[in-house]
Amino acid sequence: RSPSRGLGDVYKRQTNTRHNIGFKIIDAINLHFKLSKQKPKFKGLLTTGNIEEKKIYAIKPLTFMNNSGTAIKELIDYFKIDAKDVIVFHDDMDIDFGKIKAKFGGRSAGHNGIESIDKFIGKEYSRVRIGIGHPKQKKKVNNHVLEDFKEDEDCLLYTSDAADDLTR
């Protein structure tokens, strides 16, 4: 069993922002693998299904980013899943847009959603860091993260090949 988790923000006005890339990745995986319809559970929107005979639980927390660890904690406690089997998809400004880096464990690098998850389940889980690029000026960081994707950026997220690659 493998819970996947996408980090994002709950406000409708932030649906298409770079900060919500984790949610968009979960949506792409759900669509590509025809997982179940999202339903409210564990302080988030839960989708379940199988990918290559492996049970998948994908959740998009409906908490604020800073509290997103509560949703994953409730999910893994309920289904008795080890934290080491968790995969979290999240934005990373230190990586060029569209580039992906995966790692197991490690530090939060200042990402509030990751800090929240670390607090609730520890640091021993997989992270898939999706590059959103950096604005190069510190004062532009907040606007950059909360800006909507540009048209050419948005279309990159919904290719079936990307969903396939992210789940391997």
PLM region spans:
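Charge-dense, low-complexity intrinsically disordered segments
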Residues: R1, N16, E151
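Single conserved hydrophobic/aromatic residue that forms the stacking wall/gate
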Residues: R1-L7, Y11, Y158-R168
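Nucleotide and nucleotide-moiety/phosphate-recognizing core
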Residues: R5, D9-F104, E115, K119, ...
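Charged/polar, solvent-exposed surface patches and flexible loops
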Residues: L31, E74, H144-D148, D164
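Anionic group-transfer/hydrolysis microenvironments
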Residues: L62, D92-D96, G131-G133, F149, ...
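Phosphate-binding/catalytic loops
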Residues: K99-A109, I114-S160
